[in-house]
Amino acid sequence: MPVLTPAALAAALPLSIGDLALAQPNPPPTVVEDERLLAYVQPGQLVDIGGRRINLHCMGAGSPTVILVAGSGSWSPIWYKVQPVIAQKTRVCAFDRAGFGFSDPAPHFQILSDVADDLHAALSAGSIPEPYVLVGHSLGGIEVRLYAQRWPKQVAGMVLVDTSPAGEGLIEQNQPGFDAAYGGVASNTTPLLDCAFLAAKGPLDPSSPEHKDCIPTLPSDAPNAFRKIFPQFFTAYYFADRVSLMSSLDSHRYDSVDQRHLGAMPLVVLSPETTWEFSTPAEARVSRSYEKVWIAMHEALAHLSSRGVHRIIKGSGHHIQLDKPQAVIDAVDEVLRELNKPT
């Protein structure tokens, strides 16, 4: 997961679901609402996993089942441009982490392996049929790779969408100066902790200047029904759990995930043309080398399978599923075609 400057993070919280947010808080009357977001106004299948509920938002029918796991700040609606199209071909379920979207919080703040455990428990309790094609964006890419490492017989293929390499400390090793330029996890989580503190005092109000950096602005065509419920998801647990997830990534405890060979599993790794925008000349200088390292890491991930493919998506930023959704749809289609080939 690329590390943002505190200023950039504060300006774009939360990254991901917040990146649905690009325009005005109140659409003009002439704007036609994007009805695809209405599918996410209510929970899908709320699955009990030991006294708390995990939301699985499923569409379509068929096998294998495609499982969508969002990045660190997102939940099901981040896939609104992708999921309905995939559902025309097979069953596809978007997963909300504990405390994200309509899922209940966990009894403690989670680390990445906890999320993989929750996903496994939810798919089992929800009777979601195997095999699975796992699609993970950003931090979700590590979570789906952890899943494949722990339950390999359930996973038929994977699509990794600008995934975080599990050992982001390797970036500093390969590109000295990266941590100094971007501040590392500690400084980049400060805005999240500030938002957690505000949310702990009461519901956040998107019209409040004090809260505006914590709740992103939705796109102008977001339906009013979605706009109405959106602020309720930004709880103190949500912000604090994001810090916990990011900090667990920085601990290097998941480095081995990027080293497990996947045999002949169909695998597509997607990289953006531009990962982040940079606000200072120092960041820009580091970014040129940093992005080369990031792309090289993605290329190495693709080589973990004899049927791995790596693609750079022109015209896309970090959120390829929003910027270039067809690229994600095509990648899933490619994995499905590979699985349907005679053996």
Predicted feature residues:
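Conserved HGGG/HGGXW glycine-rich cap/lid loop of the alpha/beta-hydrolase fold
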Residues: 52-102
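Alpha/beta-hydrolase-fold catalytic nucleophile elbow
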Residues: 96, 161-162, 270
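Active-site loop/oxyanion-hole signature of alpha/beta-hydrolase fold enzymes
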Residues: 97-135, 151, 177
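Catalytic active-site module of serine/aspartate enzymes centered on a nucleophile-bearing elbow/loop
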Residues: 306-343
